[in-house]
Amino acid sequence: PAVAADAWRRYRAGERGDVLTSVMEFASYQAPQVLQDDWEALLAVASEDEVQLATQVWQGLPSATAAHWAQILAEADDDREMARARALLLAAQPETYAIARGYLVDWGRLDAEVWAHWAGVAEGPQPRRLHGERPLHFRFGREQHRAQQADEPSWRKRTWRLHPTWNGGQVHHAGRMGGPLEALCGGCHAPLQRLLQTYAAALQPGASGEITLGLCLDCCGWEDPPVRFYRHDADGLPTCHPSQHRAVPSTPTDSGDLMRAEVGLVALESARWQQQDWGQSNHRQNLSRVGGAPSWVQSAWYPACIDCGEEMPFVMQLDSTLPTTGEGTLLWGSGGMLYTFWCAKCRVSGHFWQCT
């Protein structure tokens, strides 16, 4: 916090530079409270677009300040308050969200859904959160971890060994990864592969029983449709959604088979790792996790459930560090990320990936 506080003081005094900007960005993730002592100054930083602040910074906005900002937006008659509106939208407070949303729709260049998903909420006059706040990080099995490190430089191995997202915390749930399922892909008709089998409560608080998330690694992202949907039975097992079944199977490129492993889902004590940025991580942090906020590679997007049409909450992401049985790595395109979503009402999962 001392380094962050000094950087914040120097930035407010008018000093600029790449190193200072980097410290400010990391501070917004590691010590957001340091930046929350002067909201107007923080808003000025956001309006410059030079510092990419974590969205969580604005979630601490006091209700009185939020109400004052909402009044400013309500009285504005031009687009000069875009930064204020974006910050108020990210705060996602029920009393002021609609005003921020209305201003952005009126004066911004993006539609309402884009703004809502950027804030992690469903499109509508009131915010409905589409992700949780307490992620569980994957604690990979011994053979998985050995394969993950095989071709990495020594400095990265050392970083992973010491980094809390790789080796910290306490296991809350056990799980399994890898291996074929009985269900077949609707596109290529090959068996789905097990992404994760664990207790349903890990994905949906209060749920009972188990859930198995499965996917065709060969078709997802390479063959239409871009989002793969699966219905889950009473035992939590997936089957291809009927609308995505092809009578004539496709012949996609073989992406390999996930290595079988017993894994743990770990809760970290520090609030620092509730939000993680994909670019900031730069392959140093473990970004594979269940719950919490997504680490988007591209733009934020929560798909609509194929059955009920409502935007689906985010439940899991898997980084491109997953070893396959053929001594390869699943890259999700090219160093990308797989995102998984869950509609509890319909018991439908959806999956897609993004890459650079």
Language model features with spans:
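Preference for intrinsically disordered or flexible, low-complexity segments
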Residues: 1-356
